[in-house]
Amino acid sequence: MTYPLISHPEANDGERTYPDEQLTDDGSLRLTAHNTVVSEYATRLFRGPETQRRFLCVAASLHDFGKATPQFQAYVRDEYEGPEKEKNHARLGALATWFVLDQRDAPARDKLAATLAVARHHQALPDAAQYTAESLADAFETSNSVLTAQLEAISERWPQKATELLQRSGETDSTWDEFRTWVQSGTVVGELHEVSARRELTGPKATSDKLPRKLYDRTLHYWAAITLADKSHAMAVPESHVFDVETLDRETLEEYISGLRAEPPDDELERALNDERERARRQAIDGVHEWLGGDAQTPPIATLTLPTGLGKTFTGLSAAFEARGILESDGGPTRPIVYALPYTSIIEQTRSIFERPELWGADPTKSALTVHHYLSETVVYRNERESEDVASTDQEEHASFLGEAWRDGTVLTTFVQLFESLVGPSNRQGLKLSALDDGLVILDEPQALPKEWWDGITRLIELLTTEYQTRVIAMTATQPTLLRDVETTSLLDVGREHDKTGCLRCEVGPDYPVRLEPARKETYFENAERVRYRIDESALSFHLSADERYLSHETAAARVVAATAAGEGGSTLAICNTINSSATLTQELCGHDGVTHLGEAIDSVLGANDVDATKQENNVSAIVDAILRRSGLRGVDGELSVPAGTDIVVATLNSRYRPFDRRLLIEIADTLSGSEIPFVLISTQAIEAGVDLSFKRVFRDIAPLDSIVQAGGRCNRSYEWGRNGGQVVVWTLADPDEENPGDPTKSPPAHWVYERGSSDAGIQTHLQLISSILAQFEDEEVPDAEISHHAVNEYFDALREKSLSSTKIRTLIDDAKAGKLARESLIGGYQTVDVLVATTQAERKRLNELTELFTSDDPTDRSTGYKKLEQAAGIRVSLPLNSIEQLPDVSRVDGKERNEDGVQVFRYTGTESLEYDLQTGGLRGKEDTVAGRFTTF
């Protein structure tokens, strides 16, 4: 019997739909059709040079060539009873790829990259040298029984069909018999060893030294395109959903900004600030014309360096929109804009900008905007989402697939999602990489990346800009060492020199009613005198000539109270280096008379209204209003006032709070920080980047200079308290258990973060370096630009001399060791696990339903459980792994034992040996562990 060769059997659920010409009579997907479509898709996804597209076309058209074996054809029809390995198909496809590309005289890099991409199109990429010299070479030996059985079976059953598949790429006229003769000659083994091994007396020895240069870059590129093309067609995702992406537009942003500028400013300072923001935005747009207007095939990285508070988000987006307009002027497909931020904890506020009804009113579950971080529901519904509680399996799977593959016009994500997908990605992580092909990436505050990764990040940026032709815009409030060894173009510098005369893009751009002359980049810093810095004596304790004198949390709390109370008034932000330090400062602050913490009011409102924080439709603003009224801060007339018996209102923010509660806290802080309410927010450094809040004064525990400047960016952000009306105090807090801060015996929290390496790899004498720079300022108050510009530059120059970055990532990339790269992570330090925190009856019911789904014997229930687990992101909190290990009564959400496979997510409903308290710092063990002591954020 001769089967029609198929790639996938008929779908049992009837959900997958293909054109009739791609199907057999029984509804199965034809192998020829699948290989053809995957080849077409992959070459459309790939935006590289035409020569490389032809090589990729060969690989993609042969990716499932191995499915032509009778063994696989029996297996796919549930009729196979032979040896397990003989039904595998990827390596035979890889062998055919090498054969055809060798005939086409493809360079060694392309030939090996395409072969590896096909061999691993269902898996993650391997360490290339070892896999090529050993796994592939052994599999292709003429004595290999699996290969022999597959070759013989095809020759006996349907050699003509194999010939048809082989020639489908259009790059060979060889027949099956010619291919088989070549395989049986054994020459391929020597060819593989030639590019992956050195010859020794004992035989070939795998070595990365023999690999073609930049093999990892090209392999990743081919593999990602084939993987996405293969999966999208296998899942029957509509072609238009893969390629025709919708996006947010610049025109709407221009109209929004025009409307803001039409509103009369409150005073001259606000008018001047608005003009500075708009001047910088227009200047950056002009800079894009210079950046992309040259002949360079690989444009340098564009930098946008502006003081905090000068509108980098809108300026960066405007520049990216303009760049996309230039690149798409030839009528090509829409390029995604990927906007990457440092932390999950701050991404929601940036997301809210895109969701503003008066701006784009974007819905991240629909097309145009995708939000992707580990707590988000990452989906793209191209059509209306079904109204039932659970949409069809097909619709849900497509939406999830499109979301994780970033098949959308605008993507808001984290550095972790972006860079870890380039470093030994899993098969699923690799789906998103084609969105970077000839695309645009905005890096918002890249200096927040771990310093030991900086060398690796520059190598990854090189991969993006040279292999993927990605245009990168790096936005910073400082200019870090990270970018000093790569070619960059300052959008503000070249925008200032841009000649608009004869510029076609300027001619078709918006016609602004008021002309704003461009300015020197330094002028923006000089004009942005929002704060004065004061260096506390304790911040100089690490200087060589200074005595160690730290500040107790008790003394720090007293100073915060004195600064915030009625005499001074206004709002205060106190940033600590660890969660334990922030909890201790909160406790000391609340010990003062007249201090009221908002945690109780938040708890009360959530409980009284039985709020389910897993629901997307929750109205955060309405809940915040109820909290303010419950606490007596907002009266029946809607006005804010201080209730009787209260002198200061306090809130605490860190990563141990649920994401939903963090959203509440940020909106509360946004409401109170600019009011006349004496308000204190105690936070960890999670608030420093991307959180658009403004306080009258900021206290910052000693930190790297760029972190101090980021803290200053939360102070007098829009001149609410006049020019230079904000104050930033830098001090050193003692260990919470230190008995004598004036003569300390314990290391301060800053030591554990910046020298022992809770956030970075640990930098010896780091605090000494920081203190020595701060010690140069003898005046009681230091001007803004002296710290934000000059001191920061000096700091990064000093760091550069220390050679902080590890070369490990770069070396592994250059050696094409994808398997080892997969074990590297941007999130250093301790291991964590996630806990779903239920505080209301509705949430406890939701957790119980989730556990019932995971413990069900019905696979459909478990599938539903995974979807509902994603939807529970709003109540998901990370804890150090060893904290959970010491709390045996905390159970897993899937009901399994801790050492079993399954869903490694835990549950808290209020009865376990955990506690969740909005007043004392969020989720922690009732007897907190040592691990929680030095946790940052």
From Swiss-Prot:
Question: What keywords would UniProt list here?
Answer: Antiviral defense, ATP-binding, Helicase, Hydrolase, Magnesium, Metal-binding, Nuclease, Nucleotide-binding, Plasmid
**Function recorded in the entry:** CRISPR (clustered regularly interspaced short palindromic repeat), is an adaptive immune system that provides protection against mobile genetic elements (viruses, transposable elements and conjugative plasmids). CRISPR clusters contain sequences complementary to antecedent mobile elements and target invading nucleic acids. CRISPR clusters are transcribed and processed into CRISPR RNA (crRNA). This protein plus Cascade participate in CRISPR interference, the third stage of CRISPR immunity. Plasmid targeted by CRISPR locus P1 transform wild-type cells very poorly.
Recorded protein name is CRISPR-associated nuclease/helicase Cas3
Annotated residues that bind Mg(2+) are located at 64, 122
Q: Which residues form a coiled coil?
A: none
Q: What class of enzyme is it?
A: hydrolase
The Gene Ontology biological process annotation of the record reads:
defense response to virus
Q: Which domain of life is it from?
A: Archaea
Domain HD Cas3-type: from-to ranges = 24-232
- InterPro entries, per the entry: Cas3-like_dom (IPR054712), CRISPR-assoc_Cas3_HD (IPR006483), CRISPR-assoc_Cas3_HD_sf (IPR038257), P-loop_NTPase (IPR027417)
Q: Could you say which protein family the record assigns here?
A: In the N-terminal section; belongs to the CRISPR-associated nuclease Cas3-HD family.
Among the GO molecular function terms of this UniProt record, one is: ATP binding
Reported consequences of knocking out the gene: Loss of the 8 Cas genes in this locus (cas1, cas2, cas3, cas4, cas5, cas6, cas7 and cas8b) leads to loss of CRISPR interference against plasmid targeted by this CRISPR locus, i.e. plasmid is not destroyed by CRISPR. Disruption of this single gene also leads to loss of CRISPR interference.
Further information in the entry reads: There are 3 CRISPR RNA loci in this organism and a single cas gene locus. A CRISPR-Cas type I-B system.
The enzyme's E.C. designation: 3.1.-.-, 3.6.4.-
Spell out the Pfam families in the cross-references: Cas3-like_C_2, Cas3_HD
Q: Which SUPFAM superfamilies match?
A: HD-domain/PDEase-like, P-loop containing nucleoside triphosphate hydrolases
Cofactor names: Mg(2+)
